[in-house]
């Protein structure tokens, strides 16, 4: 009669105890109050005014100090545990501010963040809080936008690591019906009648840098301009003759697809941030 050692019975039992302890510890961590974690790890953050719930599910009141009156809103999240298999924290997120509503998935890794399937609308009131322009009362529609941004590992990263930082993946569209835009510059307001346009997002590599490319086109798929954002949050703007022909004070002449304005500025400054 075969003899079965008692140690062979103990090993599976120990394994189950270990797995049980791991799941219990994970459950305990997920039930930790989000307010306590914020107080412990980011006590002086200016961006979060109130937080409730826990890591699994909760909500927060946020503000972004872009002007004398900060942009405020709310965010709700629901944790998606299967992203841990990829070494990331992932959650379903709803973001709102006045009439702005966005829904999508947010994933955060040790040196990257990712947005997937973000859709909704950005209200004109929200845009007016961010940029010092006169804008038409029409929202920007966000259609299935996905972004993946890689960060340099640390401030002393090599030049190759810094070049690797930036946008590795991008897709989706922004659409806008357009209208009259007033752009202040040099104490004067310049008016431009924006046509209905579509902004198509993609990731491109230029000069060994990973860039987010925003291709601006009209309803006839004609080119209006290009925006590029790099890993250092620098914005490159290129506008074509076709777009500037909608500005009454513009008298330049060139083939319509020719870029006639090119500007490079920090991201928020380039958007006319308050």
Model-derived regions: residue spans:
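Extracytoplasmic/luminal low-complexity segments enriched in Pro/Gly and acidic/polar residues
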Residues: 213-274
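Beta-propeller and related beta-repeat scaffolds in trafficking/envelope systems
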Residues: 75-84, 167, 171-211, 249-273
């Amino acid at each position: 009669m075969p003899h079965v050692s008692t140690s062979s019975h103990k090993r599976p039992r120990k394994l189950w105890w270990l797995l049980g302890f791991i799941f219990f510890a994970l459950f305990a961590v997920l039930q930790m109050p989000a307010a306590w974690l914020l107080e412990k790890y980011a006590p002086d953050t200016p961006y979060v005014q109130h937080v409730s719930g826990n890591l699994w599910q909760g909500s927060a009141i946020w503000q972004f100090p872009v002007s004398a009156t900060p942009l405020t809103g709310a965010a709700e999240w629901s944790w998606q545990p299967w992203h841990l298999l990829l070494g990331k924290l992932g959650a379903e997120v709803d973001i709102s501010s006045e009439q702005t509503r966005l829904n999508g998935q947010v994933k955060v890794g040790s040196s990257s963040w990712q947005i997937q399937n973000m859709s909704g609308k950005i209200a004109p009131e929200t845009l007016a809080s961010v940029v010092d322009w006169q804008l038409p009362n029409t929202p920007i529609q966000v259609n299935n936008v996905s972004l993946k941004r890689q960060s340099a590992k640390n401030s002393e990263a090599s030049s190759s690591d810094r070049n690797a930082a930036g946008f590795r993946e991008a897709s989706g569209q922004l659409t806008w019906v357009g209208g009259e835009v007033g752009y202040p510059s040099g104490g004067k307001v310049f008016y431009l009648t924006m046509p209905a346009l579509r902004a198509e997002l993609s990731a491109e590599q230029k000069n060994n840098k990973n860039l987010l490319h925003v291709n601006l086109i009209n309803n006839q798929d004609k080119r209006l301009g290009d925006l590029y954002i790099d890993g250092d949050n620098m914005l490159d703007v290129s506008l074509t003759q076709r777009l500037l022909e909608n500005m009454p004070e513009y008298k330049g002449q060139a083939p319509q697809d020719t870029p006639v304005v090119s500007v490079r500025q920090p991201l928020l400054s380039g958007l006319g941030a308050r």
